[in-house]
From Swiss-Prot:
A Pfam match: Ribonucleas_3_3
Natural source organism: Schizosaccharomyces pombe (strain 972 / ATCC 24843)
One Gene Ontology term from the biological process aspect of the record: mitochondrial translation
Residues annotated as transit peptide in the record: 1-59
Lineage, opening ranks: Eukaryota, Fungi, Dikarya, Ascomycota, Taphrinomycotina
Identification of the protein by name: Large ribosomal subunit protein mL57
InterPro entries: Ribosomal_mL57, RNase_III_dom, RNase_III_sf
Function: Component of the mitochondrial ribosome (mitoribosome), a dedicated translation machinery responsible for the synthesis of mitochondrial genome-encoded proteins, including at least some of the essential transmembrane subunits of the mitochondrial respiratory chain. The mitoribosomes are attached to the mitochondrial inner membrane and translation products are cotranslationally integrated into the membrane.
Amino acid sequence: MLTRHCNRLGLQIENKFVFRSSSWNCVRRIGKIACNENKYRYEMTSTEEDIDSFFSRVFGEKNYISDKSLREQIVTHKSYKHGLKRYNEPFVSVGNAVIDVCLLNHYLESGNFSTIPSYKDLVNLRSPARLAEVAKKWNPETATQCILPLKGPNSPSSSSFEKIYSSIVSGLVAVVYFQKGGVEAMNFCKKSIISDLTKDFVRPNTVHNQ
């Protein structure tokens, strides 16, 4: 089945490597392309001390999350080392789910059911841009590990950093959930994230009365 699929795409398999067969004079091994072919890229890396300092800023102590490899994974984006090092993406969906619950609780505690946001509102509240804004108070750039491709000799766009830093925030929530439990994760969210997400948020004119 894999062979048929490759043939449909104009690819051929030889000695377990995939080749593009359209021009055998310039055959290239897909997956073997040198990482430095695009000379325009922006790399961020950090030391163990940088990561420890970041976790100290977030939690008040670097060893709140005792596993060093987990600490490094949370600040590592999948683009770093071409995904060969453990990265934070597997934690993001769990972190986002916990943040959603905390946001909903925040509005339920008001006792005014007309203020309960729709799911679309919740997603807007924890958009990458807003989560990245939360991360700024911890100076994540000192610990982040990632590689951003560039179209030219310019700095990466702000939206690129938003995706990187928001994944760190969601990863932090998730790792607290897995290491310390749901109650601790909710407390961390409420104390360090929710107030920042909601303070300047303007809801669309959609009121949901149940």
